[in-house]
Amino acid sequence: MEKTKTKQGENEHMPVNNPSTQIYQLQALASELKTGFTEAMQELSRIQHGEYALEEKVKSCRCSMEEKVTEMKNSLNYFKEELSNAMSMIQAITSKQEEMQQKIEQLQQEKRRESRKVKAKKTQKEEHSSQAGPAQAQGSPFRSINIPEPVLPSEDFTNLLPSQAYEKAQESRSVHVGDSNVKGMMGPGVNPTTPEAEENLKSCLSADIQSKGHLPSGMWRQPKDGKEWGEEYVTKDHPDKLKEAGQGRHSSLENVLCETSLAAKRQTVALELLESERKYVINISLILKIKATFQGSDGKRNSKERSLFPGSLRYLVQQHLDLLHALQERVLKWPRQGVLGDLFLKLTNDENNFLDYYVAYLRDLPECISLVHVVVLKEGDEEIKSDIYTLFFHIVQRIPEYLIHLQNVLKFTEQEHPDYYLLLVCVQRLRVFISHYTLLFQCNEDLLIQKRKKLKKSSMAKLYKGLASQCANAGQDASPTAGPEAVRDTGIHSEELLQPYPSAPSSGPAITHLMPPVKKSQQQQSLMESMQPGKPSDWELEGRKHERPESLLAPTQFCAAEQDVKALAGPLQAIPEMDFESSPAEPLGNVERSLRAPAELLPDARGFVPAAYEEFEYGGEIFALPAPYDEEPFQAPALFENCSPASSESSLDICFLRPVSFAMEAERPEHPLQPLPKSATSPAGSSSAYKLEAAAQAHGKAKPLSRSLKEFPRAPPADGVAPRLYSTRSSSGGRAPIKAERAAQAHGPAAAAVAARGASRTFFPQQRSQSEKQTYLEVRREMHLEDTTRFCPKEERESEQTSFSDQNPRQDQKGGFRSSFRKLFKKKNGNATGEDFCGPWGWW
């Protein structure tokens, strides 16, 4: 029973399990079918998209091919039109040539008739006249212009272009015919060595406009179908109609004449361009030769000296060589319509880097010029440096020269010419390039011209030294003018003699600079001694020795270059006090020269001296001395007549000069800068305050001076020695007492006393704000003043402990400074009488 029950249970469960598995299987099949169907649909859509893309590509290719085909058709049609126009023009020209040949033949016939008539009249006059000489002179019309009797070879006239004959007949009826014009206007089958054809044609045209006695019996008859020749048969009885016929013939040839003359002029301009390019390539090849000699002479030079020449130079040389070959091929095989614009269009194209390399050359040139100056100065060969400057200048000027040449070619090019548009584009490109880099061009040109002038002056200085040594050896008197033999011996170019130094006003001291050369040590010693402070006679002697016109920007060139660099720091140091003794009758010119002498001794210090020195504050105006030492005439010379360079023995009179630090003084743009006369930098600058006052009065901007300055004596005392007034350079003058207190806190009581003393002396108005920071230059100046106080007597240092200012009136009531001031000058001057001493600025 149990077995049967289990079998029945299994049978009952079997139909229940089978449908579920079938359902699962069906669901799996359905999902598989669904995924396969979606994949098939995706593949189908992908195929459809690919077909669409292919169809679009095919359509685009078809459109592009159709456009190209239409363009080709249009170009072919345009080419056909051009060919048809050219054929029509050729046919018109050939027809005109045939007409002109016919006219020339008719002219030959008429001339033969005329010559026969002239010969007949000549024979008649010879028979009836007793003097054969005058009869011959009057009979032939060719005798007056020295033309031989015409022999008419008709085969030469048939090939002659009509434009030559009529152009020559219109311009001048003379024998002077240029060979170039004859060759340029002849046809291909013409022999240019047949002057009979020209002479015959000229004589026949001159015979047409002669007087009535030589009129021909008849003229040629023009065919009825001619457009420009409509005159009828002209007889001997109608001379007016003969003249009109001649004018009609000349007017008909204007077009041919104009075209031929323009072509000839255009060819000559192209030849000029080729010749200039040939010379230019020769010049720049010389630069490469000089570069090779510089690099080969010394292999141990550093990289800076090896870059004496711009790196783009070799590329530019190659480009100009290619251009020269192309121009030779074009110009020497010049066709009827020569084309040059495509060469320059390719040269100035953006793909070609010619203009970029040219700009790189212009930018590298100033540094290369400075290196050339240093290296050649070291080697001592100035002729090579002169040649290098000249060749550099040629390269700078080449692009403007191209513009001029192309404009000349464009001037003689018609608008219908195929080269017209190309030349127009090239000219426009060059104009834009030159206008864009005008400043670069101008800077390089000015630099090269300036270097060339300085080189000529230095070579003239060497020439003078050589002449002086020759004169010293020969025992003869030195002469400032150089002979040709001396010039030849010294190796100076003849063109450099054209710009010598002008002679000095006084003939005696003018020859003092013609001195034999000495050793370097002696030159250095003499130069340094000349820069040290001395007597006025020494300064005057040096001023006369190095005297030159003030218009020259370059300083004297008589010092060696190494000494010039070493001697630069001499005049820029602090200048101590000096005791000058000069007579009151010293002329103003000597004083001016003595004041100008130390600045004249400075060599070319443009690269070593900063662009502006420390300002002078005076009367609301600020004066500054620029670096190139700009000379200015004295504003009021009468103020200097009573001035003496003698110095008082006061330790308060200090005149020193320090250059401005740009890093420190760059934040002061509110002060206007005005040039100060050069004598303010000299050791003998005792009258510099007078110069400031004179300049301010001349400009009409000077404020009223203080009472103490007005009380200063202008005339010298009885003993002939006047106290000297220096221009104070103390930056602490004219400031608030806060400035002095700040200086006292920073540098101690001694510096505070010195700063306060400087503040009491000054009469300048307050220019700067109190919140302005103390610069490094002011700190150094106060330290310098602090050093000077160590040499003062003990009583003076004790009296300086009392700080005061002219803006604080309470200090004046105490009288501490006045008493110490009196004690100081009583002790130093030995004033035993006890008189009240009046300082250089009067009582405060």
Swiss-Prot record:
User: Which InterPro entries does this chain map to?
Assistant: ARHGEF33 (IPR042849), DBL_dom_sf (IPR035899), DH_dom (IPR000219)
Q: Which Gene3D superfamilies match?
A: Dbl homology (DH) domain
Compositional bias, Basic and acidic residues, is annotated for: 1-13, 101-113, 787-800
Record field: compositional bias (Polar residues)? 130-142
The record's section on SMART domains has: RhoGEF
Residue ranges of every copy of the DH domain listed in the record = 265-440
GO molecular function, a single term: guanyl-nucleotide exchange factor activity
Q: Does the keyword Coiled coil apply?
A: yes
Spell out the Basic residues composition-biased ranges. Answer: 820-829
Region annotated Disordered sits at 1-20, 101-142, 169-189, 498-541, 668-687, 702-745, 787-844
What is the superkingdom listed in this entry's lineage? Answer: Eukaryota
Q: Which residues form a coiled coil?
A: 54-129
Which residues get modified to Omega-N-methylarginine? 757
Residues in the signal sequence = none
Q: Which UniProt keywords apply?
A: Coiled coil, Guanine-nucleotide releasing factor, Methylation
The free-text function statement in the UniProt record for this protein reads: May act as a guanine-nucleotide releasing factor.
> What name is this protein filed under?
Rho guanine nucleotide exchange factor 33
Q: Which organism is it from?
A: Homo sapiens (Human)
What lineage is on file?
A: Eukaryota, Metazoa, Chordata, Craniata, Vertebrata
Q: Which gene encodes it?
A: ARHGEF33
